[in-house]
From Swiss-Prot:
Record keywords, A-Z: DNA replication, Plasmid
Entries under PANTHER family matching the protein: CHROMOSOME-PARTITIONING PROTEIN PARB-RELATED (PTHR33375:SF1)
GO MF annotation terms: DNA binding
Family in the record: Belongs to the ParB family.
Protein name: Putative replication protein B
Superkingdom of the source species: Bacteria
InterPro entries per the UniProt record, alphabetical: Chromosome_partition/occlusion, ParB/RepB/Spo0J, ParB/Sulfiredoxin_dom, ParB/Sulfiredoxin_sf, Plasmid_partition_RepB, Plasmid_RepB, RepB_N
Any single biological process term in GO: DNA replication
GO CC entries: chromosome
Annotated organism of origin: Sinorhizobium fredii (strain NBRC 101917 / NGR234)
Keyword DNA damage listed: no
Tagged with keyword Transport: no
Entry-linked Gene3D superfamilies: 3.90.1530.30
Length: 326
């Protein structure tokens, strides 16, 4: 197998291995250190499932969380998840609680996409049912989705703002998002400056980080720019752009120093899968970047194997005459 372009941008997106599902996660006070890594967040979220009985529920008996953390859903990512569950079954249960206001119904804490897949496949969904108060609900939801869902900055900021509007203090919001007080303050400030409709039109912007959103919020927040913002986001061509390009289009339209935005051509992804289908890989290649992502049962071990053999693989790459000329 050719080894060139095999290594850069490695991401392991395997679904969490099945766990026999956890007593309610012990809440930590403000004096305790804040969770700072995604690995730790992942372990925190899994504790909500450990030691509990996994049951099968009719997806039609499930209602969504009372606070949203996503701005739409990637149809491609959803279809990948749907195909994986159709082929292998649901590896990880979702977490639900008895609905606080509707008898014989449940409210999803986390696992909305898995529940949607089960509904579309006409299957029951594996779930852990746990009695949680609203506070524990939002912490569990925020921790699990921060660890698993690759939420963008603006999605996390929206989640933080929604929680504050529901009356939760910033200590709770920080616990849910594994963010310190300064980070939470910036998130909510961005949401306060940019109208909700404008954020909805721009979308989740997975490639846009905090500082650029802060810069945009300062531009949008200027009274002199109000008419210009409305004109840009209501232009029919605005909706034809990708979500990241919509951000760039608005930013450059408000910032005279910014470079004009060009509509980017989507990268074409290529797929690879062994005969036994124990791992699935997607990779894209451009002039300056190569990205590889893997999922399924052996994605983690195989990714670790590649990472552990980078020196050898790169040496073989150079031996095959791929050394860049000076």
């Amino acid at each position: 197998m050719a080894r060139k372009n095999l290594l850069a941008g490695l991401v392991d997106t395997a679904e969490i291995p099945h766990a026999d599902v956890a007593p309610a996660y012990p809440m930590r006070g403000a004096s305790k250190s804040m969770v700072r890594s995604l690995d730790e967040l992942s372990r925190q979220a899994e504790k909500f499932l450990e030691g509990e009985t996994v049951v099968e529920l009719d997806p039609e008996t499930l209602d969504g969380s009372f606070v949203s953390d996503r701005m739409g859903d990637s149809s491609e990512q959803f279809e990948e998840l749907k195909q994986a569950i159709a082929e292998r079954g649901q590896d990880t249960p979702i977490l639900v609680r008895p609905h606080p206001s509707a008898a014989d119904r449940y409210q999803i804490v986390f696992g909305h996409r898995r529940a949607r897949v089960a509904r579309e496949l006409g299957r029951k969904v594996k779930a852990v049912v746990k009695a949680l108060d609203d506070r524990t609900h939002v912490i569990a939801q925020g921790q699990e989705n921060s660890a698993r869902a690759n939420l963008s900055f603006i999605e996390r900021a929206n989640f933080a703002s929604h929680l504050e509007k529901l009356g939760y203090d910033r200590t709770i919001i920080g616990s849910a998002l594994a963010a310190n007080a300064a980070a939470i303050s910036k998130m909510i400030a961005v949401i306060d400056r940019i109208p909700e409709e404008t954020i909805a039109r721009i979308g989740p912007c997975p490639a846009v980080g905090r500082e650029r959103w802060v810069e945009l919020s300062l531009l949008v927040g200027k009274t002199a720019n109000e008419a210009k913002v409305k004109a840009i986001v209501s232009d029919p061509s605005f909706n034809e752009l990708s979500t990241d390009d919509r951000f760039n289009s608005l930013f450059s339209g408000l910032n005279s120093a910014a470079k004009p935005v060009r509509k980017t051509t989507p990268k074409i992804l290529e797929n690879w899968q062994p005969a036994d289908k124990t791992v699935s890989a997607k990779y894209s290649n451009s002039a300056k970047a190569f990205a590889l992502s893997m999922k399924s049962r052996n994605a983690g071990p195989f990714g670790r194997y590649i990472a552990d053999n980078l020196d050898r693989l790169y040496a073989e790459f150079l031996e095959q005459g791929n050394r860049k000329e000076d």
